[in-house]
Amino acid sequence: MSKGEIVQVIGPVVDVEFPLDKDLPDINNALRVTNNNGDTLVLEVTLELGDGVLRTISMESTDGLRRGMEVEDTGAPISVPVGKDTLGRVFNVLGDPIDGGPALGKDVKREGIHKEAPKYDELSTSEEILETGIKVIDLLEPYVRGGKVGLFGGAGVGKTTIIQELIHNIAQEHGGISVFTGVGERTREGNDLYFEMKASGVLSKTAMVFGQMNEPPGARMRVALTGLTIAEYFRDVEGLDVLLFIDNIFRFTQAGSEVSALLGRMPSAVGYQPTLATEMGQLQERITSTKKGSITSIQAVYVPADDYTDPAPATTFAHLDATTNLERRLVEQGIYPAVDPLESTSSALDPEIVGEEHYEVAVKVQHILQRYQELQDIISVLGMDELSDDEKLIVERARKIQFFLSQNFFVAEQFTGIPGSYVPIKETIKGFKMIIDGKLDDLPEDAFRNVGPIEDVIKQAEKMGVTPKNPEAKAILEAK
């Protein structure tokens, strides 16, 4: 392989000169350099400057590098371990284990992180609903197996908590292979997640890849591709249905913006890189279902300053089948998960996919909540007394629906001391149908807050000294 030498180091950007009489390394090739401490650093070729000089981005800290050091071309892109050996382990962007466990053997298969998206005739579409056990998601923005989902929200509204709950619920119920990719998020959260998964017994079916906040932009930009490469192998070679969790896809964009500035490119709107749509497309087009297997992707998307028109979340929107929008207003009201039932969407909310009953209940719930939102202006100015009897009934039912959309999470039990609940879709539909049909009008709205299925509401109401009058609700109470 050809060898060159470092001619310039500016932070994570390293310029390397190769002899003109030798073949130059290709774009995206990995280069190796050994610093004074004997540590091997990996650089990725990103630009050709001319006269044999290549501009590269380092995947690790460039401390200890200096001009004149020898650099070797590996002849291929960064490659990472794939297959069964990755399960139960934690890796960095280069595929090196960082969990303190044994090193992987030399015979472990490795694949390059840069690939083409599957061809059009290889793609497969699925209309099977993926049950999450979270009421607001299953009812109003159902997720499709093999689809792409975005969890949108500003800082501190609960994106990571929902991702952790989905990992818990789906791993317990679905039992398939999961790949978790931490992109530019807090190391503490990754550590907590690792030990939680170890304790719950799902770690043996999960591969974890981390490129956290403290790492150079090159690592944060490429770590999503590392996780995706591991997931693609399970899909294409093992023929499995894989769950790919990415937290947070915005940090991928942010790292790309940093790299773009370091490479000297002219920024575009709001300071983002001019290649934003291309980079996002190259990643998202690989996350898909083929005739061999599927990748169901759930991605947290940080929304800067709660501004959904920001280019980063706006570019991500175009690639998703379902969106779960988290709203700070609901956090302030103490409703968790703080999912906005009117702004969240799903292409699967269709009577031919979810069934007539599910669709009708979901549409009626949205209609009642929409009407309540319209009436809030009148209530805030004139008060409840100015509403007609029908409007008062809508407000009461809407508040019950709003509270019933909340529930306790398993992953939050260590903080709240309250056990979480998994609610099957059938139970979710039954509960909301009873509310919109007026069968629970006599129960206090506080009984609907942070509960699981409708049985919990009726039990909660009885503790408050209220027995339901409706025969169906009474029968549920007696059955319990």
UniProtKB/Swiss-Prot annotation:
InterPro entries on file: AAA+_ATPase, ATP-synt_VA_C, ATP_synth_F1_bsu, ATPase_a/bsu_AS, ATPase_alpha/beta_chains, ATPase_F1/V1/A1_a/bsu_N, ATPase_F1/V1/A1_a/bsu_N_sf, ATPase_F1/V1/A1_a/bsu_nucl-bd
EC number: 7.1.2.2
Keyword match ATP-binding: yes
Class of the enzyme per the UniProt entry, highest EC level: translocase
One GO location term (cellular component): plasma membrane
Alphabetic keyword roster: ATP synthesis, ATP-binding, Cell membrane, CF(1), Hydrogen ion transport, Ion transport, Membrane, Nucleotide-binding, Translocase, Transport
Residues engaged in binding ATP: G153, G154, A155, G156, V157, G158, K159, T160
Membrane topology recorded in Swiss-Prot or TrEMBL: Peripheral membrane protein
Gene Ontology terms, MF aspect: ATP binding; ATP hydrolysis activity; proton-transporting ATP synthase activity, rotational mechanism
Places the protein is found: Cell membrane
Keyword Methyltransferase carried by entry: no
The reaction(s) this protein catalyses: ATP + H2O + 4 H(+)(in) = ADP + phosphate + 5 H(+)(out)
The protein's role, per its UniProt record: Produces ATP from ADP in the presence of a proton gradient across the membrane. The catalytic sites are hosted primarily by the beta subunits.
Subunit structure: F-type ATPases have 2 components, CF(1) - the catalytic core - and CF(0) - the membrane proton channel. CF(1) has five subunits: alpha(3), beta(3), gamma(1), delta(1), epsilon(1). CF(0) has three main subunits: a(1), b(2) and c(9-12). The alpha and beta chains form an alternating ring which encloses part of the gamma chain. CF(1) is attached to CF(0) by a central stalk formed by the gamma and epsilon chains, while a peripheral stalk is formed by the delta and b chains.
Annotated family: Belongs to the ATPase alpha/beta chains family.
Entry-linked PANTHER family: ATP SYNTHASE, ATP SYNTHASE SUBUNIT BETA, MITOCHONDRIAL
Protein name: ATP synthase subunit beta
The organism of origin for this protein: Lactobacillus johnsonii (strain CNCM I-12250 / La1 / NCC 533)
Name of the gene this protein is made from: atpD
